[in-house]
Amino acid sequence: MFYGGRLEYYRMSAEQISAPRFSGFHMGNYNTYATAADGSVVATEHSIEAKNVTKDKLNYAATLQLTYNLTRQFGLTADATIATRFPRISEYAGTGPTEEQYKRVTIPLIRGGIFYKNDWIDLSSMVTYISKSNNIDQQNLTKPGTTEGKTVLLIYNIQTLGWTTSAEINPFKNFHMHALFTYQKPVYKNYNASVTFSDGQSMGVNANNMIVKEIPQVLIELDPKYDITKNLNAWLSFRYFGKTYANLQEALYFNGHWETFGGINWNVNKKLSLGVSVINIFNEKGAKGTISGSELITKQEAGKYDGKYMSGSYLRPFTVEFSAGIKF
């Protein structure tokens, strides 16, 4: 059994401008004008001032781990961790949270499973639950088909239930293999936002219970390594990322893909090391990440964008890199 804890004092003091930005924005007094029913122009005075925000808080964390051997090689394992923190100063970018929205972020993790060890394999298989409450995000919502965007403050939760099996394998001398398989389902909770654009049209996004964007549900890792000599080794790395959603409402997605790497490392002597590595061995092509400006697109509207060009990130092309390290 292993257990531990941490207590952290957190103080934040800053000057906050909570007013949204607009054309001609400036600190101090300004007027807005409207036309009354009788045709006269009515001026309304406003003032923008920085207000001090000071927080004195305690963040805490605790962990407990249990391991029980049923035999010399086989056993059960479980652990639980909880960590908390209050919003950081960086999360006050834009309008920032109000006093009512300033809440403790809580991250609990619970997992348990089995393990098996012998002379050539170290195997574990575990089920994991993890969540995060009161996550703060400044989300830019772009009106589909235009460049007009509005930034809104979102406070939501994320939770994940997953299963991971990993193995460290040494079947013969000088060879090592790391293997991992993960199936997970990370979903948004309480994720709702709406925005009104300059033409008066209101649009909303509801990602509640939808898969978190950019996070695949299936992950596979295969990492073989062979020591040719004491100072020379060759390695490969294969990563599979399953289908990932490119926007909040599961309307757009990228198919699963492999990312492959390999190389040779040579420690020439105590002061010099050389290496060569290959990225994207099979020169697989495709896109990944998110699609900018797509957050308000729904599943029903996705068909309208078939065959259209949209911006995102791409898989790194086939690349060969040479490296050298010198120690003085």
Region roles according to the model:
Residues 1-17, 120-121, 169-183, 266-282:
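Hydrophobic, aliphatic-enriched repeat segments that assemble into extended interaction scaffolds
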Residues 1-132, 182, 223-225, 229:
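Structural signature of Gram-negative outer-membrane beta-barrels, strongest in the C-terminal barrel
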Residues 9-10, 129-131, 153-247, 323-325:
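Gram-negative outer-membrane beta-barrel transporters
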Residues 13-52, 94-98, 137-151, 189-209, ...:
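Solvent-exposed loop segments that connect transmembrane elements
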Residues 61, 67, 74, 105-112, ...:
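Conserved C-terminal beta-signal and adjacent last beta-strands/turns
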Residues 72-81, 104-161, 166, 170-176, ...:
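Membrane-embedded beta-barrel scaffold of Gram-negative outer-membrane proteins
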Residues 84, 186, 281:
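Hydrophobic pocket-lining residues within nucleotide cofactor-binding pockets
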Residues 87, 134, 284-287:
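Switch/connector loops and helix/strand junctions flanking conserved nucleotide-binding motifs
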